[in-house]
Amino acid sequence: MNPLTFTMITSTIILGTSIVITSSHWLTVWIGFEMNMLAIIPVLMKTHHPRSTEAATKYFLIQATASMLLMLAVTINLLSSGQWAVSNMIDPLALTIMTLALAMKLGLSPFHFWVPEVTQGVPLLSGLILLTWQKLAPLSILCTLSPNIDPTLILTMSILSVLVGGWGGLNQTQLRKIMAYSSISHMGWMTAILIYNPSLTILNLLLYIMMTSTTFILLIITSSTTTLSLSHTWNKTPLIAIIILTTMLSLGGLPPLTGFMPKWMILQDLTKNENIALSLFMAMAALLNLYFYTRLTYTTSLTMLPTTNNTKIKWHFKTTKQAASLSPLIIISTMILPLTPTMSALW
């Protein structure tokens, strides 16, 4: 891609998300969503492959439908209250339609079907942007609307998302699909606590972005897209194999790694709000995610395939642009569980 074009597209993606997050008027929120959507399409079609074109088309159709529902909800609220302010959405029907529209944009169940297909059809870097940065804008609007959202609707979607994210990833061998189902599950955890503690949703999102970014950067460095290609990592670079193991277990929420912290804090808040059954159910559903991540780490680090590699084992990383950002990301993704009491006090 031309450097000037790439700079313009990246700037538009960042600007669109920033407009959505900082806006207090529904019209500018809609403009920000549209800027972001139109700018991400060339990023998804970067490889000029039929699968990338198909993925970009699916993404466009889903996001356009969600934007249409968003404007429908805004119009209904405008007719009933005469307000354009984001914080003044009080009409129950408008709130329900808005919640469904934002759920489509986030990929929450039962609107999750596009997430694995689109992620599988795009390059790893595009998949990283799709599963991390693209979650910021819709989730920020959900946090703003959280005091008025119907608890039954949002909790139903969060429970379904955790279940679908766990069950869907069990029989997958494509790493991008596994990361997509992991994203669906994490979105379920974030929305489960949304109506009780929106700031904890933001903390969960930030940690999820850190862990997912670390995993994707490692996959980009090793050029791994399937479990078979990932299984050769130990023969080439054992250090990367060990880091992938710990990062994936952290994504699964295994203590004493970072990924256990948001789950711990969310379950604690749910039990404080007397949602014992919901917290127990979500803790059990989280085992599904942990299972397929454990299976991945077994394939990656606990088995060694026959190899004819006659070169010396490469303990060092390749000198790449992505490797420079790995050190802080790895530390954040795996080692900040001891900060949980501080995080609980702050969030």
Swiss-Prot record:
One GO BP: mitochondrial electron transport, NADH to ubiquinone
Catalytic activities: a ubiquinone + NADH + 5 H(+)(in) = a ubiquinol + NAD(+) + 4 H(+)(out)
Coiled coil: none
Transmembrane feature ranges: 13-33, 59-79, 84-104, 111-131, 149-169, 178-198, 201-221, 240-260, 276-296, 326-346
Pfam families: NADH_dehy_S2_C (PF06444), Proton_antipo_M (PF00361)
Membrane topology summary: Multi-pass membrane protein
Keywords, ordered alphabetically: Electron transport, Membrane, Mitochondrion, Mitochondrion inner membrane, NAD, Respiratory chain, Translocase, Transmembrane, Transmembrane helix, Transport, Ubiquinone
Localization in the cell: Mitochondrion inner membrane
Top-level class of the enzyme under EC nomenclature: translocase
Family statement: Belongs to the complex I subunit 2 family.
The protein, known as: NADH-ubiquinone oxidoreductase chain 2
Encoding gene, per UniProt annotation: MT-ND2
